[in-house]
Regions:
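Bacterial N-terminal signal peptides
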Residues: 5-17
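Scaffold signal of the M16-like zinc-metallopeptidase fold and its non-catalytic homologs
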Residues: 21-22, 93-94, 139, 146, ...
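Mature N-terminal segment immediately following signal peptide/propeptide cleavage
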Residues: 28-67
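Buried hydrophobic packing residues in well-ordered domains
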Residues: 48, 66, 84-86, 127, ...
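M16/MPP (pitrilysin/insulinase) zinc-metallopeptidase core fold and M16-derived inactive scaffolds
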Residues: 63-130, 173, 194-198
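M16/insulysin-pitrilysin zinc metalloprotease superfamily fold
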Residues: 95-96, 130-161
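Acidic/histidine-enriched alpha-helical segments
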Residues: 102, 110, 151-169
Length: 213
């Protein structure tokens, strides 16, 4: 699956009163866009990556979030649910960090006491982790690594399909989720919002490694 548009990196920092980007000269290739309600916006000139920096002095922790402006609306009939499955695959390992080497993304996050998760929606997919603030650089390195070097293997897809199928069944057994799914399918008949972010069962079951790549 080809990622569309440029992602946004969001950092909620709880370190010093002034963040490094604010108090020091900007690194080459980073431009300041604006300041709004205490939020600093930057842009990486080489690829358009947006950066939002939100300092918070309350606790010695930080949250790093990467949001890709692609979601289930970018899917077509036959590939619905692929974005959500790819979200799951993002935790399975990369060329550099993988279970075969003994340290994949999840194990690295656990080692530093971080809590990581992700969500998929119609217009975006986001990945986030909260950790002690001294590990922000490591979290960003891991995000950059899986952005570029994700391993999408048959065995990993097979294991995640069980997880995704169980998630799908929970939704089918929820009256509220079923109502919302039918509402969107009726209201957006000629629009990609008509299919749920988790996808249709037949499409989920036929998802292949080639499609995800």
């Amino acid at each position: 699956m080809r990622i569309l548009d440029f992602p946004i990196l969001v950092c909620l920092l709880s370190a010093s009163p002034a963040s490094p980007l604010i108090s020091q000269a900007l690194p080459v290739g980073v431009e300041h866009v604006q300041t709004l309600d205490g939020i600093e916006e930057y842009r990486l000139s080489s690829n358009g990556l947006g950066i939002l920096l939100m300092p918070n002095e309350g606790l010695p922790v930080a949250t790093v979030m990467v949001t890709y402006k692609v979601g289930s609306r970018n899917e077509v009939t036959g590939t619905t649910g692929a974005t959500h499955i790819l979200e799951h695959m993002m935790f399975k390992g990369t060329e550099k960090f993988n279970s075969a080497k003994g340290f994949d993304y999840s194990s690295q996050m656990e080692r530093i006491g971080a809590r990581a998760n992700a969500t998929t929606w119609f217009d975006r997919t986001n990945y986030y982790a909260t950790m002690p603030s001294e590990y922000v650089s490591m979290a960003i390195e891991l995000e950059a690594d899986r952005m570029r070097g994700l391993l999408i293997r048959e065995e990993d897809l097979a294991s995640e399909m069980t997880v995704v199928s169980n998630e799908y069944e929970r939704g089918e057994n929820s009256p509220v989720r079923t109502l919302i799914k039918e509402l969107f399918a009726t209201a957006y008949m000629a629009h990609p919002y008509s299919h749920p972010t988790i996808g249709w069962r037949s499409d989920i079951e036929s998802t292949s490694v080639e499609e995800l790549r």
